[in-house]
Swiss-Prot record:
EC class of the enzyme, as a word: hydrolase
Species of the source: Escherichia coli O6:H1 (strain CFT073 / ATCC 700928 / UPEC)
HAMAP family: FrsA
Keyword line: Hydrolase, Serine esterase
Keyword Hydrolase applies: yes
NCBIfam families according to UniProt: PRK05077.1
InterPro entries in the record: AB_hydrolase_fold, FrsA, FrsA-like, FrsA_esterase
EC number: 3.1.1.1
Known catalytic reactions: a carboxylic ester + H2O = an alcohol + a carboxylate + H(+)
Keyword Hydrolase: yes
Listed name of the protein: Esterase FrsA
Family per record: Belongs to the FrsA family.
Function: Catalyzes the hydrolysis of esters.
Amino acid sequence: MTQANLSETLFKPRFKHPETSTLVRRFSHGAQPPVQSALDGKTIPHWYRMINRLMWIWRGIDPREILDVQARIVMSDAERTDDDLYDTVIGYRGGNWIYEWATQAMVWQQKACAEEDPQLSGRHWLHAATLYNIAAYPHLKGDDLAEQAQALSNRAYEEAAQRLPGTMRQMEFTVPGGAPITGFLHMPKGDGPFPTVLMCGGLDAMQTDYYSLYERYFAPRGIAMLTIDMPSVGFSSKWKLTQDSSLLHQHVLKALPNVPWVDHTRVAAFGFRFGANVAVRLAYLESPRLKVVACLGPVVHTLLSDFKCQQQVPEMYLDVLASRLGMHDASDEALRVELNRYSLKVQGLLGRRCPTPMLSGYWKNDPFSPEEDSRLITSSSADGKLLEIPFNPVYRNFDKGLQEITDWIEKRLC
């Protein structure tokens, strides 16, 4: 089946698909304080989703392309779930968030198919994969159209990997008690086995969102990157996120001695946002298998346990948390009680001495991850490093912060 035919088949209207903002039904969508964060973007009036320009541009999307798609959504006069929110158009049609971003992805998919130069074709496939992922964002459970966009993103990513430098292998890992999970091992040029970074991504991202991290920071240093999806999304969708948040990553770590391309004696974990919750758990529970752990904007305690902090977080992000926990209809109080159990301090881990070297990068006044969370991580480590990343200029400082983190990982890993 051709890629174009697959798109037509997946998105063929069958019934009235639920609109994304209606999938979690607990929170009152009232006025909220404006939020701006380097890793999560910012709240913009009249949008349900946070607009994450920095990360989308970092992944290779042109800022003008973002504005063009937003404009198409804004200009639509189709029926919306909430007339005050542009990105709540009902049904797969013009103006719907998933429709517009997927349509943009198909443009690049067609360019990729028409391009004869393999590397340029690979770039176009990667661009399409990123746009399909934005279409599926924020990846709420039960969002049928988003899941179809994710399937197209994975297909495009596999096409890109066949054409881009280095080697990528799709790997299946067995997890006792449930379905196996699929990960991607990205390997630089040269002979393995390679020192490897196990990526622990945020809850609102897919494993295929981190190719830029591999290409710009790890591959030039001869470091491989292994990704898996977080529980409840993508290739890990059959697994619910639980208080044992590192379960899937632990089973992957235990399998690495049997992966010939990975030097299992030189493995690091790198956690973005809630992925840092996973990475720090690994530092405590799997210290013999991990050389180092690095975190960026970690969600390990305050957001999970402080009601005032939760009140400052946008509706969309709380919906993501509720969706991952399988609490689509729970009360606010029930969600607060459950989130508290995910705090690594409440679990009795953070605060105890940890032998694994840990670095944590943070931004001042980050609504999702205060400085205290990063200090708690680094002060718990026998070899901790605290890294403050200035906010402005946001893109340059983000890049500089990632370079410093990669330097730190390389020094201890290689």
